Amino acid sequence: MREILPGIFTWGSTYADRPWDLNGYAIALHGCTVLVDPPAPEEGDWTSFDVLKQIAKIVLTNRDHVRDTKVFQTRYGAHLVAGTDEVTQLAPLVIDEPVRESDLVADALRVIHLPGKSPGEIGLYIDPAHHAVSRELGGILILGDAIIGHPPGALGLIPEQKLDNPAKLKLSLRKLLDYNFSVLLLCDGQPVLKDGKFKVGEFLNTLANY
């Protein structure tokens, strides 16, 4: 696990059937840590997690990003957070905190509902009003499967056959431009550490042509 930004850590796993890395994030907040879409610890390195502030919540952005959540939940007793419309999609996993558009998770992470890949997919905007690092960097956005960092150095969508409603997803992605952000942390593929909103805007313009 490495510190990708001050107080924000990332780690990942590689799978033979995926041409991109699967990333998890740990966000250190006042009094607790929130995990997002956690894959297995690299080489079983639990020490890096044990030294963090209390891991109080695990956010699942969508039904396909459960990954190693149960292992983390068992070890740390964290509550599970997911979009309200994704709760049934995640069964039999029990979601402790269903969230909707604009809800605030752990007093810092603003929920963005992004349906299309699945009914209740969410993104997280680290609200600059509640987070000093996000404020200093011009905003931080975290996405699960709504947009991925593949091919390397570019943005893309997961294969269309895995999308419930491609047209709905493309429409819902437009709301990302309502937020100010420079950093784009992706749970699939390479993150974008500067000019994130500009690159998302460029990507969405290419989608409009299809």
Task: Spell out what each predicted region is.
Residues 6-9, 15-17, 32-35, 41, ...:
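Metallo-beta-lactamase
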